[in-house]
Amino acid sequence: MDWLAKYWWILVLVFLVGVLLNVIKDLKRIDHKKFLANKPELPPHRDFNDKWDDEDDWPKKDQPKK
């Protein structure tokens, strides 16, 4: 078990390479053109800033400068 204490980082690298290869393999399986052709419509974005839109602090354009 002395080798495990010395070379644990190699096992981590092998694990990360395996994860990376599986991700690449899975991403190649995705057909993005088919998804984009059949993607669902998104509902309109609702934010809660709509009540603040009326409270505009910017000066009006038609007001003369003081």
Swiss-Prot record:
Region (Disordered) location: 39-66
Primary location class: membrane
Gene Ontology CC terms, in alphabetical order: plasma membrane
Localization in the cell: Cell membrane
Spans through the membrane: 4-24
Chain intervals with Basic and acidic residues compositional bias: 42-51
Protein's UniProt keywords contain Cell inner membrane: no
Family statement drawn from the similarity comment of this UniProt entry: Belongs to the UPF0370 family.
Name of the protein described by the UniProt record: UPF0370 protein YpfN
